[in-house]
Amino acid sequence: MRSRAGIIQVPEGRRVIAPLSVAENLQLGRQAAGVRGSDAADLERVHPLFPVLMERRNQISGSLSGGQQLMLAIGRALMGRPKVLMLDEPSLGLAPVIIKDVFRALVQLNREGLTILLVEQNAKLALQTAHRAAVLEQGRIVHQGPAAELADDPVIADHYFGRAAGLAA
């Protein structure tokens, strides 16, 4: 966690502290980032995005579903008041309805001014969510630009999605 630089990562695999409650996990995000003072404003930011965290605040984190653990990991990161939120494969292994909820929250956070760096294996979803995108092959950037342009590029669509039409197909 690089909270001093304002960068906080939500790693692949969620990594919640399983024996602690949801509320305790959220507080760890503040402590790790060195945030002082009342947590009320931070909780007011997290709970509307992920109401289940408020409902389950006293539940042991390890008993949450995978989607709920991801929401908790993102909530914990937000408690540290990041300037940049990095997410590694947030959709991995989640049900489509949970993915939709999580990405809706990410879009909202971005609209509120939070910069989000997203590494995502679901290219269609990533390009529908992002403003800008980069396509990497073997650790090298092979395409980059506005996400909408990449999504409509027939070469990228054919190579990465197996069709010559854009992502809308």
Regions found by a protein language model. Name each.
Residues 1-169:
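Glycine-rich phosphate-binding loops of nucleotide-dependent enzymes
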